[in-house]
């Protein structure tokens, strides 16, 4: 989780250049407690933070003042964070965007990157991880976690990818995965976020 701690110093001049003079940061997340903690932590690291708790609010703020940096939750109460990414990219093509989610899969990560996100971080991500992702140089990757995905996680992400490709149609997804519809429904119910 995000802690209210002393800001991590930016140790390289090139990193400071990547943040640059425009320190505007839009954070879009429907988890109010997480949103406020992250906003405080990023302000402590030198950003001028604006927050939004919905897709509609995020798009409105992106249209009014497109930010130089953005941290966007993928799944919001009123839609997908991908819509906010598109709105920002439509107004400003140099925005450095990071997608956060507690319910991720490979297909949505690929979509987010195709739309212009720099990276895709799983929740809970701390402010230092987010800062590192925001200031990474082009072509540079933040170190991946040491623990590789389990076979169960790979299977789940494959199911999620096919489910998203089928526009969340359970019957079509079950056909494509060659499994019974009820089996798929049980898997989806078991792994659904609470």
Swiss-Prot record:
Write out the entry's keywords from A to Z: DNA-binding, Phosphoprotein, Transcription, Transcription regulation, Two-component regulatory system
Q: How is it modified after translation?
A: Phosphorylated by ActS.
Cited Gene3D superfamilies: 3.40.50.2300, Homeodomain-like
Q: Which residues form the Response regulatory domain?
A: 24-138
What are the protein's GO molecular function terms? DNA binding
Q: Which InterPro entries match?
A: ActR_PrrA_rreg (IPR047772), Bact_response_regulator (IPR050595), CheY-like_superfamily (IPR011006), Sig_transdc_resp-reg_receiver (IPR001789)
What SMART domains has UniProt attached to this entry? REC
Give the modified residues of type 4-aspartylphosphate.
73
GO BP annotations, alphabetical order: phosphorelay signal transduction system
| NCBIfam families cross-referenced by the UniProt entry | ActR_PrrA_rreg (NF033791)
Describe the function of this protein.
Answer: Member of the two-component regulatory system ActS/ActR acting in acid tolerance. These data implicate that a two-component sensor may be involved in pH sensing and/or response.
The protein's name? Acid tolerance regulatory protein ActR
Which species is this UniProt entry from?
Answer: Sinorhizobium medicae (strain WSM419)
Annotated gene: actR
